[in-house]
Structures are given as structure tokens and as C-alpha cells.
Amino acid sequence: MISSNDFRTGTTIELDGAVWRVVEFLHVKPGKGSAFVRTKLKAVQSGSVVEKTFRAGEMLQQALLEKSTLQHTYMEGEDFVFMDMSTYEETRLTAKQIGDSRKYLKEGMEVNVVTWNEKPLEVELPNSVVLEIAQTDPGVKGDTATGGTKPAILETGAQVMVPLFLSIGEKIKVDTRNDTYLGRENG
């Protein structure tokens, strides 16, 4: 059990048979009446967002999520297959369960798979990944006066803005949280 006073961004609770993650919260103490906590909750399974208000000190069931490190081994149709490298047990996730994470997911990558009641809910990517540029416009000499950027499509299909001097085949580091270029990767 968790009190609504203890809500923080990222806290997970069980509500109406589903798992919800606190995206925003605000403790409100009006001049008249009792205090309350106004929250914005995101459903972990579906991604829908709702605003909900709780009484201050209201007790709620905290969702106990388990994280396990699995390796993405291959695709089978529309399913992503992951393997626990210690037990060699396979876990299958649909494209819907993977969500936006699939644009950075490549075979052989290790990720955290979050489960609740032994059901996989979502995939947590590392904060940054190294990917190869598959397609981009060639850089034109002398076109860097303003330090401009150009779109690049990576080997997984993700699109990020990269500096003009980068070309096809180069490996770059990308921040998976906000889809930004972090730098070149050597080696």
C-alpha cells in the first residue's frame, strides 16, 4: 500500500485492475476544505492518460513490477522474441506492447522487460544506443556555417536529426528518451 502523499513521478499503482504510472502530481491545500493530490496517470498497458484526484493520505495498492534483463533475439512475424540469457527461456512481446521502443530495438540488444503478475508489460531501453546511419543526404562542403542538421534514417528505421558532416554507414550514439543525436561512436 502507498499513500497518495508519497506519490512521485514514476510511481506505479494498481487501479481498476490495471497498472498506472504517475506522470505528474500536485499536492493542493485549499484555504477551505481538505487537502488533495491532483495527478496525471498513464496506463502502462495501453498508454492512455487520465487525470485523477485523490484525497491527501488516501491509501492505494502499489503495483509491484519486476524487471528482468532479456536479450532481443529475433522477430517472428509481428512478435518480438526475447531470451533470458541465464535460463534460455523465451518471452514474446507484440509490437503494441513494445510501443515506440521498437524504433531503437535491434537483434542482440539487451533491454529490461517489465512484468506485472508474470505478464510482460513494456520494454525499457538503455538511455542511449549505438546505431548505424542507413540513409541520409550527403553533406555539402561549406554548408556548416550555422551548425545545421539534417534528417537521417538509422538501421532500425528510426529517424533523428544529425549534423551535416555525418554520412551513410557511420555509427552514432542516440538518446532513446528524446530521439536526439549524442555523438559519433568510434569502433
Curated annotation (Swiss-Prot):
It comes from the Bacteria. One of its GO terms (biological process) is peptide biosynthetic process. Keywords: Cytoplasm, Elongation factor, Protein biosynthesis. SMART domains: EFP, Elong-fact-P_C. It is found in: Cytoplasm. GO terms for molecular function: translation elongation factor activity. InterPro entries: Elong-fact-P_C (IPR015365), NA-bd_OB-fold (IPR012340), Rib_uL2_dom2 (IPR014722), Transl_elong_fac_P/YeiP (IPR020599), Transl_elong_KOW-like (IPR013185), Transl_elong_P/YeiP_cen (IPR001059), Transl_elong_P/YeiP_CS (IPR013852), Transl_elongation_fac_P (IPR011768). Its main location: cytoplasm. NCBIfam families: efp, PRK00529.1. This is Elongation factor P. It comes from Synechococcus sp. (strain CC9311). The gene is efp.
